Swiss-Prot record:
GO CC annotation: cytosol
Positions contributing to Mg(2+) 2 binding: 308, 310
Keyword annotations of the record: ATP-binding, Cell shape, Cell wall biogenesis/degradation, Cytoplasm, Ligase, Magnesium, Manganese, Metal-binding, Nucleotide-binding, Peptidoglycan synthesis
Residue ranges constituting the ATP-grasp domain according to the UniProt record: 138-339
Official protein name in the record: D-alanine--D-alanine ligase
Organism (species): Tropheryma whipplei (strain TW08/27) (Whipple's bacillus)
Enzyme Commission no: 6.3.2.4
Single GO MF descriptor: D-alanine-D-alanine ligase activity
Positions bound to Mg(2+) 1: 296, 308
Length: 347
């Protein structure tokens, strides 16, 4: 029997999505794994959760069972200190940081686990940080010859000092409509379509409420497609392209992703998508991703253009990633991810 320490919740805006992903995993994980659920509250407290509520998008509550991480590297054991002072130890083989957004998939928790020499599922510090920061994703991938949209970066600390200058440079460089988004947020938080110049300052302010910097780029009239990747017995396996039919918004926002009905079209039926698996694999390896990821593209007349990379995609029942592999059940997708990570631990 193998033991999996499942980290979920976290301090980001995607706390409830992580909770839902963890709940789905707990319901479908195979019997070969004993799961140790450790939630992170919105304030950053690590707590041992003997159960996870059946609420789809719940919240990790401080139940008094605080988790103490090992004080020396290589020790795969946590101490659970209960409210009345009693404590007990729990051993594990592998950590699954099923966390979304900042302080979860941006390299921070990965750095802590690396420092403690604790094996974990998913990409390491560099790949996680580079994929989370859309500015550096574009820099790295464009240097590797992967098509990306042109962009303009606005750092939060400079915006209020040079607002008029930024607005002029953006209007000189681009034509409307534009798309404004935080540089380091997920689940489409802080994103806005901008049709006119007058809407631009508000959109930038909105993005900066959700991230340290904002990115402005052309708003393409082009479908977005998704490619999920998973390492299977040492071989990177790409799913077919997925297109998501949704209604009620101009883009695949939080409501469409998690609240409203959607339809997955697999495979996506668009021209100019030849070679998508090679491009997605190149992105995966250029950033040094591990175990699993999702790559998002726009389909243009000249071919695929990279949008974003997600090193910790949602694993809810409604999420794109587990739905992408039509020949695999949800439990098989999870087992493949875990087997890939566990094999690397045993080497």
């Amino acid at each position: 029997m193998r033991s999996l320490l499942l980290l979920f919740g976290g301090r980001s805006q995607e706390h409830s999505v992580s909770y839902a992903s963890a709940r789905a995993l707990l319901e479908h994980i195979c019997d070969e794994w004993t799961v140790i659920p450790v939630g992170i509250t919105k304030h950053g407290d690590f707590v041992y959760c003997s159960t996870v509520s059946e609420q789809d998008y719940g919240e990790v509550i401080d139940n008094g069972n605080r988790v103490v991480w090992p004080s020396r590297a290589g020790c795969k054991k946590i101490e659970v200190v209960q409210a009345r002072g009693k404590s007990f130890f729990v051993e594990f083989d592998l950590v699954f940081p099923l966390l979304h957004g900042v302080f979860g998939e941006d390299g921070t928790i990965q750095g802590m686990l690396d420092l403690l020499d604790i094996p974990y599922v998913g990409s390491g510090v560099f790949a996680s940080a580079a994929a989370m920061d859309k500015h550096y994703t574009k820099i790295l991938c464009s240097h590797a010859g992967i098509p990306v949209l042109p962009w303009y970066l606005i750092k939060g600390h400079a915006w209020h000092k040079n607002r008029d200058s930024f607005l002029k440079q953006i209007s000189d460089r681009f034509t409307f409509p534009l798309f404004v988004k935080p540089v380091d947020a997920g689940s489409s938080f802080g994103c806005t379509f901008v049709d006119f110049f007058e809407q631009l300052p508000v959109a930038i302010e909105h993005a900066l409420q959700h991230g340290k910097s904002a990115i402005v780029e052309p708003a393409l009239d082009a479908p977005e497609v998704f490619c999920s990747l998973i390492e299977n017995n040492g071989v990177l396996q790409c799913s077919e392209l997925v297109f998501v039919k949704h209604s009620g918004s101009k883009f695949y926002d939080y409501s469409a992703k998690y609240l409203n009905p959607v339809e997955f079209v697999i495979p996506a039926q668009f021209d100019n998508t030849d070679g998508y698996a090679e491009i997605a694999s190149k992105v995966f390896f250029e950033l040094g991703c591990r175990h699993y990821a999702r790559i998002d593209f726009f389909v243009t007349e000249s071919g695929l253009v990279l949008n974003e990379i997600n090193t910790s995609p949602g694993l809810t029942q409604k999420s794109i990633f587990p739905s992408s592999f039509k020949s695999m059940q949800y439990s098989q997708v999870i087992e493949t991810i875990l087997a890939s990570a566990y094999c690397q631990v045993k080497r």
